[in-house]
Amino acid sequence: MITLWGRNNSTNVKKVLLTLEELELPYEQILAGREFGINHDADFLAMNPNGLVPLLRDDESDLILWESNAIVRYLAAQYGQKRLWIDSPARRAEAEKWMDWANQTLSNAHRGILMGLVRTPPEERDQAAIDASCKECDALFALLDAELAKVKWFSGDEFGVGDIAIAPFIYNLFNVGLTWTPRPNLQRWYQQLTERPAVRKVVMIPVS
């Protein structure tokens, strides 16, 4: 049995949930983090000393794993043959680079908007900081749009781990009431993303 600790509105938890759903794997989710607590309990910290979600335990392989990208890579390798796993090291690297880019680049701009706009009361918002994050996101959207002019998915010809890493961020940014510069290729990717049942189930929830 696979057990996942994490709350549904966490961007990083969504990546793991999306992977589990795409692979149609049975799992138990234990809500944890922020208002749910648990992540600072001794039992949790014994498994993940960082005290963060997501955390995954796979009894079948006797594995406890944290860090969302590591979990997604593991699930794809362990259970995603002929689906999310790409046999070619070169093609796989092309997809996986977007996982690191999303965590190192896109997440920072996304965080400025999520925390500054969504999780901060109107009277306490720093509009200048929000505007700066919006400008940064718009530039990143241009980069993504240019990439998608060449490929169908960030993972190549098929949906894969590169798309899983980016999807929760883009969904949030497209659904917080902001207006963005039109990016036709990114919009095309987003539209085909929203047609996937797993995305509808675990990614397309109210942004909070």
Curated annotation (Swiss-Prot):
Residues engaged in binding glutathione: N12, N39, V53, E67, S68
InterPro entries: Glutathione-S-Trfase_C-like (IPR010987), Glutathione-S-Trfase_C_sf (IPR036282), Glutathione_S-Trfase_N (IPR004045), GST_C (IPR004046), Thioredoxin-like_sf (IPR036249)
Enzyme class: transferase
GO cellular component, one term: cytosol
Entry keyword Signal: no
Keywords: Transferase
Catalyzed reactions: RX + glutathione = an S-substituted glutathione + a halide anion + H(+)
GO molecular function per UniProt: arsenate reductase activity; glutathione binding; glutathione transferase activity; identical protein binding
Gene3D superfamilies: 1.20.1050.10, Glutaredoxin (3.40.30.10)
Transferase recorded as keyword: yes
Transmembrane segments: none
PROSITE patterns: GST_CTER, GST_NTER
Domain GST N-terminal: from-to ranges: 1-83
Superkingdom of this protein's organism: Bacteria
Domain GST C-terminal: from-to ranges: 88-208
Disulphide linkage map: none
EC number(s) reported in the record: 2.5.1.18
Effect of a null allele: Mutants are hypersensitive to bromoacetate.
Function recorded in the entry: Conjugation of reduced glutathione to a wide number of exogenous and endogenous hydrophobic electrophiles. Catalyzes the glutathione-dependent dehalogenation of bromoacetate.
Family, as annotated: Belongs to the GST superfamily.
Name the record gives this protein: Glutathione S-transferase GstB
Organism expressing this protein natively: Escherichia coli (strain K12)
Gene expressing this chain: gstB
